[in-house]
């Protein structure tokens, strides 16, 4: 389990709070302007025709609101939503039970859809295309296949790893939306809205202080808001100002770039112990006492995305941004250009 404060993965507390503060309509949805405008058009058009919305794939890094957008789609269409995840649907019968209980135009939301098994995918193809499923009745020589008609429905799939989707499944989605990391202004608006729903007192500088350290991720912003709330109630008068938020973040070891202690240890190890790299992952793991898998899957992605770390064929390297962030001078690169005036071979005499 990942217990980092700035992890984008959801905890039990996150899920409970998210349900309470989740926007219900596109008008309440902050950020992702292109996605919001496109979905507004698609939803209104489908509603106007009295049809189910096209099957929709939502992908992007964790914590950006894929589940929230699925709920909004169902609310905007005025239908119910059934929610499940790829690993849960391990048998075709599990999927068939869900599909046959849907009402016309309902939304079936499948999180981690890239983890569907091949046999379940085979059942899903005719369901998505023809709104029919084939079910086997009986066993052995007496077994026979029957077709069941399904009501028109919308499959909304969410994934953090769109590249792992099979081509036949990906091609059956009529709408594909990618969620991008949020800018500080949008995150500040999300923090302000969440604080209002949680009855917290906060000013603009407090919102910006939290938003700037949230790594572009609403889930992290809301988690930091709750921890700053705790600090404000115990160490201040309950109001979250810029100064209070800054003091809380310093206590929590989250700096202005959203780095925590693990991020700083990794970058400093590469710069101070390995002259900025390149250095192999196993050497880094030994230097900071962390598991290779944790570094690769948990710590590195954000540092690479933000331009502080590079993966090269020879290993990891700290970028110029990393040296500047810590106020360190990068080592001088050796000059490998040839010297035209030294060690030149003797010129023979002309005859």
From Swiss-Prot:
Residues 256-351 are annotated as: Head domain (RuvB-H). The keyword Protein biosynthesis does not apply. Residues 1-182 are annotated as: Large ATPase domain (RuvB-L). DNA binds at residues 292, 311, 316. It catalyses: ATP + H2O = ADP + phosphate + H(+). It is found in: Cytoplasm. Keywords: ATP-binding, Cytoplasm, DNA damage, DNA recombination, DNA repair, DNA-binding, Hydrolase, Nucleotide-binding. Mg(2+) binds at residue 67. It comes from the Bacteria. ATP binds at residues 21-22, 63, 66-68, 129-131, 172, 182, 219. GO terms for molecular function: ATP binding; ATP hydrolysis activity; four-way junction DNA binding; four-way junction helicase activity. Belongs to the RuvB family. This is Holliday junction branch migration complex subunit RuvB. It comes from Alkalilimnicola ehrlichii (strain ATCC BAA-1101 / DSM 17681 / MLHE-1). The lineage of its organism: Bacteria, Pseudomonadati, Pseudomonadota, Gammaproteobacteria, Chromatiales. The gene is ruvB.
């Amino acid at each position: 389990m990942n217990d980092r404060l700035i992890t984008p993965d959801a905890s039990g507390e996150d899920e409970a709070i998210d349900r309470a503060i989740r926007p219900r309509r596109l008008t309440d949805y902050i950020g992702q302007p292109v996605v919001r405008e496109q979905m507004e058009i698609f939803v209104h058009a489908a509603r106007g025709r009295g049809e189910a919305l096209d099957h929709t794939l939502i992908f992007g890094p964790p914590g950006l609101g894929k589940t929230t957008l699925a709920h909004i789609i169902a609310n905007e269409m005025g239908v119910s939503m059934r929610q499940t995840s790829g690993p849960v649907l391990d048998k075709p019968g599990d999927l068939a039970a869900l599909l046959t209980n849907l009402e016309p135009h309902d939304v079936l939301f499948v999180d981690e859809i890239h983890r569907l098994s091949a046999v379940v995918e085979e059942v899903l193809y005719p369901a998505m295309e023809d709104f029919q499923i084939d079910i086997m009745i009986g066993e052995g020589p007496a077994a026979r296949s029957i077709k069941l008609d399904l009501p028109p429905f919308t499959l909304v799939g969410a994934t953090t790893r769109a590249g792992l989707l099979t081509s036949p499944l990906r091609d059956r989605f009529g709408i594909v939306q990618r969620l991008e990391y949020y800018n500080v202004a949008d995150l500040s608006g999300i923090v302000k809205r969440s604080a209002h729903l949680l009855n917290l007192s906060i000013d603009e500088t407090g919102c910006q202080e939290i938003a700037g350290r949230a790594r572009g991720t609403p889930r992290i912003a809301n988690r930091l808001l709750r921890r700053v709330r705790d600090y404000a109630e115990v160490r201040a008068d309950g109001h979250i100002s810029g100064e209070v938020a800054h003091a809380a973040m310093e206590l929590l070891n989250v700096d202005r770039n959203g780095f925590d202690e693990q991020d700083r240890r990794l970058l400093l190890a590469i710069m101070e112990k390995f002259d900025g790299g390149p250095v192999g992952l196993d050497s880094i793991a030994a230097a900071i006492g962390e598991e290779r898998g944790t570094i690769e899957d948990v710590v590195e992605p954000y540092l690479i995305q933000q331009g502080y770390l590079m993966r090269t064929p020879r290993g990891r390297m700290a970028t110029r941004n990393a040296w500047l962030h810590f106020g360190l001078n990068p080592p001088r690169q050796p000059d490998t250009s040839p010297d035209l005036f030294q060690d030149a071979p003797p010129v023979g005499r002309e005859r």
